[in-house]
Design a protein with these regions (language model features):
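Acidic, Ala/Val/Gly-enriched low-complexity intrinsically disordered segments
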Residues: 2-9, 22-23
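Cationic, low-complexity basic patches in intrinsically disordered or flexible, solvent-exposed regions
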Residues: 12
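S-adenosyl-L-methionine
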Residues: 24-70, 80
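Structural motif
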Residues: 70-72, 96
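Class I SAM-dependent methyltransferase "Motif I" SAM/SAH-binding loop
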Residues: 75-76
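Conserved SAM-binding loop of SAM-dependent methyltransferases across substrates and taxa
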Residues: 80-90
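Class I S-adenosyl-L-methionine-dependent methyltransferase module
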Residues: 88-191
Length: 191
């Protein structure tokens, strides 16, 4: 399982706390995107990462000259196109994202609004997982986290931490639910 957040990201977030504005998280996100190569932080089936050139070719020829552009992403998934557009076009002042998966949207909102509370939750679940020595114990932890995640009564921080964990440790980063709406992907070989 990869580290939940790059140390540089956390340091950057800590530095931007000195900005006295209600929009500091937006400012830190924009400056972070401009200073780093932001990439999707979750795996997602059907990602647009390999289609970026074809999709970008569909933009109006003068798009980079538009003032205060708004980017709308109706099927954000892992966010490859979103991150590319925000880095490539500094004239995009607003981004609106959507997806049918409410837990995915909760994940994006939690990263945007509560990253400082999310980081310790991710570190805790990662430490528990790495402390396990054998594959059987790791598989048991995966199943316990999956069961708790499926209870659907979690606060956004816990929900997102479990969502991340399952995404990183399940089979191929797949998100699939059964007829009851319960996440049912087995553990993967990332263990």
């Amino acid at each position: 399982m990869a580290a939940p957040l790059d140390v540089n990201v956390r340091q950057h977030i800590n530095k931007t706390k000195g900005i006295h504005t209600d929009d500091w998280k937006i400012i830190s996100l924009n400056s972070l995107i401009m200073k780093t190569k932001a990439k999707p932080f979750i795996k997602w089936v059907g990602g647009k990462g390999q289609l970026i050139e074809q999709l970008e070719a569909k933009l109006p020829a003068d798009f980079d000259n538009w003032d205060d552009a708004t980017y709308i992403e109706p099927f954000v998934g892992g966010g490859a196109m979103l991150f590319y557009m925000l880095q490539r076009y500094p004239n995009i002042k607003y981004a609106v994202i959507n997806d049918i998966n409410s837990d995915l949207i909760t994940c994006y909102k939690t990263v945007r609004d509560n990253v400082e509370e999310l980081i310790p939750a991710l570190q805790d679940i990662q430490a528990q997982y790495y402390a396990l020595q054998d594959m059987g114990a790791k598989r048991e932890m995966f199943m316990a986290v999956r069961q708790r995640y499926n209870e659907k009564n979690l606060d956004p921080i816990e929900n997102t931490a479990k969502f991340f964990f399952l995404n990183r440790t399940c089979f191929n980063g797949l998100y699939r639910v059964n007829k009851k709406g319960l996440f049912n992907v087995p553990c993967g070989k990332f263990m």
